[in-house]
Amino acid sequence: MHKDVRHRFNAAFTPEKYEAFLHTVNTAYGEPVTFRVCETPVFVPRDLKNKLLKGVEDICAVITRPDFRKKSAAAIPPHIQVPNEAEHTVFLQLDFGICRDAEGNLTPQLIEMQGFPSLYFFQHLLAEAYRKHFDIPADFHHLFGG
């Protein structure tokens, strides 16, 4: 996605670096990963990052409206509703797929919204391992807040 950084990353990639990276991920906390880990991080260009952030802001504006719970109550069948649910979730995860629009530009499309922190720790570990074993530019962050 970010062509210059992608080219530099690919040019410097070696199977040995990837194996060392996997070793870090699998041994850092005593529990090996049970799924395939991608050889490379995703390098998101600034314009796509801004589109992602705008999408998050738009979704949050809807789900934090005072009337949202009332309007969405029928979306969850009574037999799977959670008793004593908090007014707002502590965690919010928005998963986006990256597609091309009619003009060929990269654009995010919401895939899923979750209210639990299932992968936060692993994603931080993964980002740190990429930095340890590969030359990731210092101004690229895995957290949008920097």
Positions of PLM-derived features:
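Preference for protein termini
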Residues: 1-146
